[in-house]
């Protein structure tokens, strides 16, 4: 059974939701763009609390289909101020699909100076204080692997995202747990930061 995970950074809540009927049959880019179009006010500030960051694997995630494990990231772009989708390869897209998560919708903002990381498993999701704030992507992943092991996949933004640089990307780990797959268009890393 697939579902959405809605993460509110202000209240620190993570809530699993049934997928609304109007999203049936959508995945990846189609899903991220539709959610952003319906839920984000087009005149909001891209780096403000009313923007949302949406992660969605494609419909063929967790299958052996070529390119089936890609992941799409959508938001209002700080570069174009329009709906932006950026996608990446790596392991996280397939892992989300295996967990039955069709989309993660991150909304609102944490208090300035607070950094959080999302821990996901089959039946739970929670925000915990970040242990990797201030680290570059490679150092952050190395530290996360020490904590969570090598059977996970990781998503990081590094310093560029933390500083909300509008060209910042989001890094996704590959099979060797290197953060070398990037969603690099539209400044999505700045929105995550």
Q: Language-model features: where?
A:
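Conserved oxyanion/phosphate-binding beta-strand-loop segments in alpha/beta enzyme cores
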Residues: 32-69, 151
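Short, glycine-/Ser/Thr-/acidic-enriched flexible segments
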Residues: 9-12, 20-21, 60-62, 78-79, ...
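Short helix/loop capping segments that flank catalytic or ligand/cofactor-binding pockets
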Residues: 15, 63-66, 164-166
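Short, solvent-exposed amphipathic alpha-helical segments in soluble enzyme
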Residues: 21-22, 70-71, 171-173
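A generic structural signal for short, non-catalytic loop/turn and secondary-structure boundary residues
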Residues: 9, 46-50, 66, 111-113, ...
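Active-site cavity-forming subdomains of large catalytic enzyme subunits
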Residues: 93-94, 98-193
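Internal mixed beta-strand/loop scaffold within catalytic domains of large alpha/beta enzymes
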Residues: 63-106, 178
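N-terminal basic/disordered segments at the start of proteins
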Residues: 1-40
């Amino acid at each position: 059974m697939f579902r959405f995970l809605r993460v509110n950074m202000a209240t620190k809540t993570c809530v699993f939701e049934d997928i609304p009927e109007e999203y049936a049959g959508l995945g990846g880019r189609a899903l991220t763009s539709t959610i952003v179009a319906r839920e984000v006010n087009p005149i909001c500030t891209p780096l403000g609390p009313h923007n949302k960051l949406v992660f969605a694997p494609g419909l063929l995630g967790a299958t052996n289909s070529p390119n089936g494990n890609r992941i799409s990231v959508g938001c209002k772009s700080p570069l174009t101020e329009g709906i932006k989708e950026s996608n990446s390869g790596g392991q996280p897209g397939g892992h989300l699909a295996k967990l039955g998560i069709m989309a993660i919708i991150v909304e609102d903002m944490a208090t300035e100076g607070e950094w959080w990381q999302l821990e996901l498993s089959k039946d739970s999701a929670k925000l915990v204080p970040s242990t990797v704030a201030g680290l570059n992507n490679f150092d952050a992943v190395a530290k996360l692997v020490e904590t969570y092991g090598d059977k996970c996949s990781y998503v990081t933004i590094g310093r560029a995202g933390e500083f909300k640089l509008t060209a910042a990307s989001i890094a996704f780990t590959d099979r060797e747990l290197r953060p070398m797959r990037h969603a690099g268009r539209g400044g999505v890393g700045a929105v995550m930061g």
